Each structure stands twice: as structure tokens, then as C-alpha cells.
UniProtKB/Swiss-Prot annotation:
Family matches, as Gene3D superfamilies: Metal-dependent hydrolases
One GO biological process term: tRNA 5'-leader removal
Superkingdom as given in the UniProt entry: Archaea
UniProt-recorded name of the protein: Ribonuclease P protein component 3
Job description of the protein: Part of ribonuclease P, a protein complex that generates mature tRNA molecules by cleaving their 5'-ends.
Enzyme Commission number: 3.1.26.5
Entry coiled-coil feature ranges: none
Gene name of the encoded protein: rnp3
Length: 240
């Protein structure tokens, strides 16, 4: 299972601190949402070497990602175009109906994060996300860090989102959205907290595993061996 983290300068902990803590908690990998924290894996650089070193040192996968937080769909589209070829995982922050719609209708987007952040998510968006292979994030951070009315509202949003996503079989990811290594929770804690408020345990595990599945798929697509889904270049195949 994987967790998707915010690292310095966007978060309060370095990638190394996140990796060390996540490994200790039993994660197989982390997805680093913060673009500035790691250079793209496609480029040979000090940061790329650091990611490899972290994998070697902690035995945990470190995935370069970007979380695009744009003011509108036009700006988000430009950012997706800029980062898709460089980043292993591309996320778009929701926040209004226009951004949510853009994200689920754009196959180059891997994950729509925080879809209830200021807009709404309905059956039309759920079907579009399913058809375009865009995962919808369930941010469980409020289960651990919010209190009072804010926590109640977040839970209501999560339950509404779950009903729509499960009904239309929309792909999903799950995260506690940690901004510090102190915010990280072991997979079993995330599952237990979600189960306590009515979520199916295996469904939550699927959402934690999905981050790694997205990374694996995208790495394969970027490799020279990839031709199309289900077909790889063999030793006797050449470009036409």
C-alpha cells in the first residue's frame, strides 16, 4: 500500500523523513505530491539520484508526482500539458465544478484530489471519471485532524462521495493527505478509522494500493518496452 504525501517546501517534512516513517509503518511506497521536492524521474539529476537512494536505503518506493492547484480549468489544462510527460503521477486539485469536470474528462489526469473542496461531485462526473480512468481521491485527513462541525461536514461529504463512486464503479484512491511525517498513519490505522465511520475495510485498502498501481502503469507506459496495453516490444520486434 502507498500514501501520497506533501513534502518540503509544500509540507513540513522532507521526502527522506516521510520515506523513513512510511517504511516503518509498513507502506510499500510514497507518492510525493510536491513538485519542488523531487525532480522528475525522467531526468538524471541529484534529486532523481536521491529518490533512488531513498528506495535503496529504506526499501520503499518513492514516486515523483505533481499536484496541480489551478484557479480554473484553462490554467489546469496548461499545467497538465507541461507536467504529464515529466511526472509519473499527475493530480489535479478540485475546488469548483469547472475544475472537477475538467479533471474527470481529461485522460492525462491520474487523480482528482479533494473533489469536495468547494464544488460538488455528481453522477455525471463519476461516469466521466470511470470512462477516462481518472481516480477520485478520498481524503481521510479530517478523520485524524479535524474536530467538531468541520469533521462532521467532512464525513458527510465523504459518505456522499462514496455512494456515488461505488454506484458507478469509479476508480478511487485513499489518503490521509499528510503534510508532515507526524501526520502519517499506518495502513491499519487508516483502515480502522475509515471502517469506524462506515467504510468497507477492503475498499479502503484498494484505495491505498491504487496509488502504487497508477505509478506502475505510468512507468510502464513511459518505458521503451511499451507499445500498447497488453503488448510489449519483444527481442525480435523493431520499429516499422
Amino acid at each position: 500500500m502507498y500514501e501520497a504525501v506533501h513534502a518540503h517546501p509544500d509540507g513540513d517534512a522532507t521526502v527522506a523523513r516521510h520515506a523513513a516513517t512510511a517504511e516503518r509503518y509498513g507502506y510499500e511506497g510514497i507518492v510525493v505530491r510536491t513538485r519542488e521536492a523531487l525532480d522528475p524521474a525522467s531526468k538524471s539529476s541529484e534529486h532523481a539520484d536521491e529518490a533512488t537512494a531513498l528506495r535503496d536505503e529504506y526499501g520503499i518506493d518513492v514516486v515523483d508526482a505533481v499536484e496541480i492547484d489551478a484557479d480554473n480549468a484553462t490554467s489546469a489544462s496548461g499545467a497538465v500539458g507541461n507536467y504529464r510527460s515529466d511526472r509519473t503521477v499527475v493530480c489535479v486539485v478540485g475546488g469548483d465544478d469547472g475544475l472537477n469536470r475538467f479533471a474527470v474528462e481529461e485522460p492525462r489526469v491520474d487523480v482528482l484530489v479533494r473533489p469536495m473542496g468547494g464544488g460538488d461531485f455528481n453522477h455525471v462526473l463519476a461516469k466521466a471519471a470511470r470512462d477516462n480512468g481518472v481516480h477520485v481521491e478520498f481524503d481521510l485527513g479530517p478523520l485524524f485532524r479535524a474536530t467538531g462541525g468541520k469533521r462532521v461536514r467532512a464525513l458527510a461529504d465523504l459518505r456522499k462521495l462514496r455512494e456515488i463512486v461505488t454506484y458507478y464503479d469509479t476508480p478511487h484512491v485513499v489518503s490521509a493527505n499528510p503534510r508532515s511525517h507526524l501526520d502519517l498513519r499506518a495502513p491499519r490505522e487508516v483502515v480502522a478509522a475509515a471502517e469506524a465511520v462506515g467504510f468497507d475495510a477492503e475498499w479502503v485498502r484498494e484505495g491505498l494500493r491504487a496509488w502504487g498501481e497508477i505509478a506502475t502503469r505510468n512507468r510502464e507506459r513511459r518505458s521503451e518496452a511499451f507499445i500498447e496495453p497488453g503488448v510489449r516490444r519483444g527481442r525480435y520486434e523493431e520499429d516499422g
